[in-house]
Amino acid sequence: MKVNSVSLFLRYADRHPEKMALLNPGKKPGTFGDLLTSGEGVRRALEQGGVPPGGMVLLTALPGPGLFAAVVGALACGAGVVLVEPFMPVKKVEEVIRTVQPAAWLHDAVGFFWGVRVPAVRAIRRRRFLGAIRPRPAEREPLLVPEDYPGVLTFTSGTSGQPKGVMRAQGYLIRQHEILSDAMQTWHYTDSPDLTVFPNFVLSNLASGRGSVMVPSRWRDKDLRHLRELPAEHQPVTLTSGPAFLLHLMRAGGLPGLRSIHIGGALTDNAIFERAFACWPEAHFYHLYGSSEAEPVALADARTAVVASRERGYFQTLFLGKPVPAISSRTEPDRLWISGDHVCPAYVGNEAENRRAKRRDARGRLWHNMGDRIHSDERGWWYAGREFQPEEDFQLEQEIYCWLQKSKSFIQRLPSGKRLLIGEGIGHLEEDLRRRFPVLDGVRETPVIRDARHRARLDRKKMAARAGVAAPASQDVAPEPDGLRLNPLPEGGV
């Protein structure tokens, strides 16, 4: 079957060209009509430049109307888009470009200066500045291509620091949109914008005819002030973000008009959710579980999830709810394997990660290792830590967080097996901590360092190094799974 994911966007862009599609606070909004004509300009530029269907286009631009118009244009002509984590080291970017060999490079001013640092990017012969591409009337249908043709290929650093490419093919983009819409019932809010920090949700919103308000990555107070000053028709009624942005938004005064709030991407303290419940008492809250490779995997009503987690004595919201119907799953003692139409295929450019995280069963079906330990009961799934962290250490962390009433520390195992507690605001409590938790062998005070991609997560490796503690390999990279052949389960089964 031949498809093109841009067809979803066109259904609404043709009918409502004047409707806001993308807005960065403090800047002029981009309409669906703007994205349509700018995307057609990009499509023609790529076709005239000789980029074939199935060819790859490197895109380096700040999130906003220009970037997403370029995505629309590239996908419409059957090309795939390559996005690279902006803080990836130059040598790693060089590896990515040599692996993918993009046929063209599209960039804005910031993206140009990011790219010219990399010899392999400078060597791309076809390059265009997005601001110089003229919008064109969109008079043609998107080119239909096989479902497995490249859509959006995103490279991140991965657990080991080695780049890994997550491919969202054309067919995948369509199915992910359908599953997200069904799971989160976003059709209730198609007439009003979504405030989001996740680009994949922006694409899904565009496919639904919804506008998206995107906050620049620095989350400056003036950007949040601009949000509150938006006209009524541009005020977001839903929020899709991680717990760090939710907390930042509440500290800045919040947005009173939010009616549905979707939080995922990292563990969330129960107290953050409870503060949000008080800020938006009438809003519905979703607790999302997923990953770059599959979004969503499971979801729960966040109020229910917090109550369930509190009942078990957890400091963080560990109840995940039920897997979405489109997911097949298998739980093992320390791993969760999933399969489904919106689970990304093998990684591009990282065979070590493929050996660790991908398996085919006897029927040839591909399964993905989420890297998490999941328990299940009659209510649903419970998160129990990463697969490479001993479960008793994860449970001990929850107990310590409850005692400290904060989650700014973690257990670090030494090669000898000894346990150190590393974190912020704990040095003066060492005597009390070791008396209360006698399995601790020491306490190391160090400032909190957050993960660059997931700002709610502690960067355990950097914090351990800052504390003068070398992290054993078992906490840097998950071990390779055994050669067990996986048997498929019924849809949605555990």
Predicted regions and their residues:
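Conserved pre-ATP/AMP-binding loop-to-beta segment of ANL
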Residues: 2-3, 17-18, 136-155, 162, ...
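Conserved AMP-binding/adenylate-forming core of the ANL superfamily
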Residues: 20-50, 62-64, 89-94, 168-171
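Conserved AMP-binding A3 loop
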Residues: 29-33, 151-178, 211
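Conserved AMP-binding/adenylate-forming
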Residues: 44-87, 191-196
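Conserved AMP-binding/adenylation subdomain of ANL enzymes
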Residues: 174-193, 198-238
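Gly/Ser/Thr-rich phosphate-binding loop
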Residues: 236-238, 250-314
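Conserved C-terminal "lid"/linker of ANL adenylate-forming enzymes
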Residues: 410-415, 419-420, 429-486
